[in-house]
Amino acid sequence: MKITVLGVSSAFATGTYTDAITVPQACELAKKIARASEWKEASDEVIAAEVNKLSQRYYAPQWQSNFLIEFDMPGKRGKGGPYRLLLDAGADLRHALKGIGLTSADIDGVYISHPHSDHIGGIEYLALTTLFNPFYTPAKKEWLAGQLIADKLFLEQEMWPTPPPNAKPDLFIHAKVLGPLRRAVGPGLDTVQGVPDVRLETYFNIQIIGKQESGETKKHVFQDGEEHWKMTPIFAMHVISSSEEMASYGISLEHDSGYNVLFPTDTQHMMPPQLVSHYRRANRIYMDCETAKFPSGVHPHVTDLVNRMDPDIQKKCLLYHYDQCPEVPEGMFAGILKPGDAHTYP
């Protein structure tokens, strides 16, 4: 299993602007300075002025905290693999995917932890671009048989109220998150011209995991070569207002060997009481880490992680979901994540 960091930033973090020149421009300028005799005695000010003539304003973005998890198993897209699962889909998902050379066409499924925009804002992008991609999967191409998706759903709505499961991405979600997700993304997805009854199932093969109506806790097992990873949703409280509460359902990924990777996702507390055993059992923890000057009270703050967290837990934690990169004592944590970082487990 390979986990790649798409973004590490908090919901409202912003990037930075800088003045710069491109590598080709820098090479041309360097050759000009090296070869022309009049440049040999040029002052720093003259060289700086020449650079400024070429410089442009560039933006270094900060992507929201989402992840790509890859399993060595066949994907929906008719290739040998990997199966690519998104852990949350923030509003800047399309840009974050482009940063690692991927698009929605490369994604097989998504897990949604809770309905804040930095975790679901990219659902509309993922849904619409895969729905209107006739080649998203070989099964979809065969099912469409040359028809446009809107025509297929309109003309054959009795037979096909929604596309078949192998023609759309998987959506793994806890039952208590599904309703809020429907309300949040529904208006933006009800946009297939002429087709009645467009809903979340039109776009996704929904798989509810976690506690079922029967009382059973349903898990999902991913093949990973000759091995397997079991994905289980875990409950953590994120926000409590005067009248409502919002939980975030993180995931525990357990390998056949017992090796465990824990994503609590957004949590109100550094180590919620109900997750103590999960933290202790985990071999690696992807840890929510707020660095805001004024703590929000709905994320663990870096000062608490440094001063109050058990050292045995600290050593397991990879920190993310920050505004500014956290300043922590060297060696205290397993690391501070950056976009593009990748780790292979177990």
What positions do the PLM features span?
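Binuclear metal-dependent hydrolase catalytic cores
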Residues: 1-262, 313-316, 324-346
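Cap/insert and terminal regions of metallo-dependent hydrolase folds
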Residues: 260, 267-346
